[in-house]
Amino acid sequence: MIAMGLEGSANKLGVGIMRDDEILANERLTYAPPPGEGFIPVKTAEHHRSRILGLVAVSLEKAGVDLDDVDIFCYTKGPGMGLPLSVVATVARTLSLYCNKPLVPVNHCIAHIEMGRFITKASNPVILYASGGNTQIIAYHNRRYKIFGETLDIAVGNCIDRFARALKLPNFPAPGLSVERYAKLGKNYIELPYVVKGMDVSFSGILSNIKRKIAEDEQVKRDLCYSLQETVFSALVEVTERAMAFSSSKEVLIVGGVGCNLRLQEMMGIMARERGGVCYATDERFCIDNGVMIAYVGMLMAKSGAAFKLGECFVTQRYRTDSVEVTWRDY
């Protein structure tokens, strides 16, 4: 089976093609506004609209297949920003109708999880899903990815990105990467609010507090980036460890764009090893939003018997991870 996946839930536009378990193409473009600016939905959607057909053509060429060779078209149903999601869904529906091939709507969060499991070969891990739009601690049970804990306000990636904008750090290739680079030069830890409530975390207060500490001195900016990472990542490690203890799992898998951060991987790895376990993570090809993860989960769904009418193939900005029945797993 050959599947094409289209992703565009935020500022990343991705087209991926897979033939069963073989990745044929994984192409991606990024909408990056000027330093200090965020991702405005209208502008993000226009970026996707003007580039998606070209990216589809590039992906087909790289994969060495024709459009007629594609057996199913898959797209991100949600969660995400409404306008960018709609652009990608419209193209996916058009391709499906034009080629008379099935269309599969995919949950963005589930796609991150299953792609992480596919790449790392993690069996049944506790999952930390950390991105610009989501922060969840997840484990599989009874054909669902259950949410053990999550952010009570803003996502960890949103917190980091907004602080990067406050510092006027570059948005390309990613504001979080700019913070990570600054953090590596930090020397002094500056105390920040640390908010963990049971299995849930909160980052809005940290963001408000750290913005008030910004100074012109470059070293202060580096120290603040370092302190922000240490604080928010410590909270994530704490709640993830609690989920591992509850589930008796020896595996933890980090997915989502923030999962690219090497310091987060290091801290989570230390915790996992102290528990006699292992931490799995992927590189930026698969941690960051991409089309191939959509193609992969679409294939899993189709092979397990999922079928959708065109009228069911819409988008939703709020599409919970635990609302999806996982029909392709038998353990």
Curated annotation (Swiss-Prot):
Residues the record lists as binding substrate: Y129, A130, S131, G132, G133, D161, G176, E180, N261
One GO molecular-function entry: N(6)-L-threonylcarbamoyladenine synthase activity
The keyword Zinc appears for this protein: no
Cofactor note: Binds 1 divalent metal cation per subunit.
PANTHER family given in the database record: TRNA N6-ADENOSINE THREONYLCARBAMOYLTRANSFERASE
NCBIfam families membership: arch_KAE1, gcp_kae1
Subunit architecture: Component of the EKC/KEOPS complex composed of at least BUD32, CGI121, GON7, KAE1 and PCC1; the whole complex dimerizes.
Family per record: Belongs to the KAE1 / TsaD family.
UniProt protein name: tRNA N6-adenosine threonylcarbamoyltransferase
Organism of origin: Encephalitozoon cuniculi (strain GB-M1) (Microsporidian parasite)
Encoding gene (name): KAE1
